[in-house]
Amino acid sequence: MGSCFSFQIAVGDQTMNRIFDCLIGKSYIRTLEKNLRALQREMEDLRATQHEVQNKVAREESRHQQRLEAVQVWLDRVNSIDIECKDLLSVSPVELQKLCLCGLCTKYVCSSYKYGKKVFLLLEEVKILKSEGNFDEVSQPPPRSEVEERPTQPTIGQEEMLEKAWNRLMEDGVGIMGLHGMGGVGKTTLFKKIHNKFAEIGGTFDIVIWIVVSQGAKLSKLQEDIAEKLHLCDDLWKNKNESDKATDIHRVLKGKRFVLMLDDIWEKVDLEAIGIPYPSEVNKCKVAFTTRSREVCGEMGDHKPMQVNCLEPEDAWELFKNKVGDNTLSSDPVIVGLAREVAQKCRGLPLALNVIGETMASKTMVQEWEYAIDVLTRSAAEFSGMENKILPILKYSYDSLGDEHIKSCFLYCALFPEDGQIYTETLIDKLICEGFIGEDQVIKRARNKGYAMLGTLTRANLLTKVGTELANLLTKVSIYHCVMHDVVREMALWIASDFGKQKENFVVQASAGLHEIPEVKDWGAVRRMSLMRNEIEEITCESKCSELTTLFLQSNQLKNLSGEFIRYMQKLVVLDLSDNRDFNELPEQISGLVSLQYLDLSFTRIEQLPVGLKELKKLTFLDLAYTARLCSISGISRLLSLRVLSLLGSKVHGDASVLKELQQLENLQDLAITLSAELISLDQRLAKVISILGIEGFLQKPFDLSFLASMENLSSLWVKNSYFSEIKCRESETDSSYLHINPKIPCFTNLSRLDIVKCHSMKDLTWILFAPNLVVLFIEDSREVGEIINKEKATNLTSITPFLKLERLILCYLPKLESIYWSPLPFPLLLNIDVEECPKLRKLPLNATSAPKVEEFRILMYPPELEWEDEDTKNRFLPEMVSTSTSSKDPLLRNGIPRCLKSESTLLLLILLYLSSCRAFGLYN
């Protein structure tokens, strides 16, 4: 320790007493080493006790308990002591060096004394804290929150949705959450359940504010409702302007962790103008709302809102049973089956299930139930409770549309059958002719506006998008289909008939099993008539429909249409006769339909166009697709207003005179046509308007693709029964083994669908690298195809990543196919890969990161054995594999039925639609 210091002092001197006290009195210096060791040991024990207490607190808080204030004070003191202890121990080596005489003395009396005293006192405090850390209780129930439980009825089928919505709202990164869904679907009930959970968990939030907004609510009313919850609404406050009120609301809420719940909003609520602090991860506040419009969700800042859907069939039946009651259901064995049928009419809509269930609760006679089914089938608006309890509630969604054209578009959709898919492209073309989309003469712009209008209806939950998995294979052009909920459809028909006062305005008996035209009391009152999807064979009656503008007769068994029936239809704008497979002749009285703009004769046996057709000066849309017996369209050049024409799959595609007729149609903007070998040379203007092209019977080797480059609007191409070894663009005639691409040739930017069928000499399709927006690729029965994209031919095109827009890849009966692409591809939008009878294809161009955002990705493959890029890829995609059987040629009729097809009727409908589409595209003979 070094030499000890010496000093001389008289005994009894005051200085000596102080030194003695420093060295011996409290033993701060003499016991310093011992105290330091004890402090380290006791501090370690205290930390262990601290961890035990913290774990107890965490467990209790996970049970929504609140930690005791004494526990928090103790934990804060431990943290403070821990810091102080670390500081003291960090300088202990220096302090120990100051000691001498085996620790009995020190070179620096004052500093060693002070340090020793701090160590001693800290040691005592650590011991005290350690003894105080033995808590019997670390928490207590939280104080009652300012959340008044809202009365709710028991719910059925919403438990999973409630859990998902609650968990999402409680996520740290979620400040704003929207729930959207159609009227009557149960949004408010679900919202109340969420509200009441805040009452269950207690003081996590300082205040939960519930506000019913409703349609047309003003800012001042919202401020007043919120102020009442915050106890601000005195006379002085009421006299302030909106800006000052917002300041007061913001001042109160800024210091609180709040939840604002806005039920039933119809437009964006300006939170800032009201005075609501914007929710963030810092303030941990929440704003939740319900709305019928997905568009409002986006405007409010929730770009991933949660949709509240109708109940599944079994949940709907359970709810309906509860409303009807066991006594009624057990009163007669037959009633249970009838009750199920009534419940099915509600299509899972809780509002309808509740109202109709309550109405039927006292009905114990079988005949009463049979009558209810008849009314709900024939005219649901007449059912008790429908006009005053269901339809007016749904009508709010219609009223909120604002734009009269969009309202008319919505009502027009009611002409289609219940549960029927509405093909968007044909619907929009009809809406254009009806005048609902405006006066734009450019078809593409008008169609885009039509899609925007349907988007508005979809976001308002008045229509539902369907067919994202199968749509591109089931339709000719449509990107998607839409359907209208049955109860919403009844609301539309109710509105269209002036709330039931003029039922003959809209005569809609689609899919009604009719064998003849229904009786109509006043033909002169009929504005629109839909008799599609029935079994009507003849229409021979006379009808004076002088006001009729729309007539749907498609998908019947029509053989004869009397001229007397259409004689007085001078105002008829839309006439759809498609899919009448035995219909072979239009009456000459067609010439009297002077207002006709839309005529669909596709999938009929019509053999020639009537001479009077040329009198239809306003005809804008003419569909003659798949008229296999139509020999001539002579005189069509007289239809000077024609803008859209389809001759796809028609027999006239082999007649060169057709092109001469078409070249005279100066206003033609959209043409679908099938070309045979002798018609490869096209007028430049005509080529530019082709949107759908079928090619059949080409024998060139190789096939020069250059003539297609001028078809700048080509969206769909199918090639059938053609024999060429490759498809190429003209650049060099000397080397036919490579794909020669001329950079000056525009790529096929609009091509979204490609079908290759029975092209037995083709070896690859490398040229599709120049179709960057391809959505569907279908290749079938082409024996020589060995690869989709050839690596050697694409050597100079490595900068192009193929299939970035592809959703559906179907490969069938390709015995030599070994490769799709030589390395993994991202496939950001891919939904399905369907492979059948491609025995040499053992590897798909996938890795673990392919198809990243697709929830319903599916692979149908027979046989299912594959080589994978790596183990991660296998784990990613193997669960999505569906083995297919070899019993069917059709890729949709195999065992790998999509998960979305839950009912036999839906599956049958899709199969029939698909087969129809395959015939339409000429995929099957």
From Swiss-Prot:
Keyword Coiled coil part of the UniProt annotation: yes
PANTHER family linked: NB-ARC DOMAIN-CONTAINING PROTEIN, NB-ARC DOMAIN-CONTAINING PROTEIN-RELATED
Notes concerning its domains: The LRR repeats probably act as specificity determinant of pathogen recognition.
Superkingdom in the source lineage: Eukaryota
Annotated spans, Disordered: 134-154
GO molecular function terms noted in the UniProt entry: ADP binding; ATP binding
Amino acids binding ATP: G181, M182, G183, G184, V185, G186, K187, T188
Coiled-coil region(s): 25-69
Purpose of the protein: Probable disease resistance protein.
Keyword Cytoplasm (UniProt): no
Name of this protein: Probable disease resistance protein At1g61310
NB-ARC domain segment(s): 139-442
One of the GO biological process terms: defense response to other organism
Keyword tags: ATP-binding, Coiled coil, Leucine-rich repeat, Nucleotide-binding, Plant defense, Repeat
LRR repeats, residue ranges: 525-546, 547-568, 571-594, 595-617, 618-640, 641-663
Family: Belongs to the disease resistance NB-LRR family.
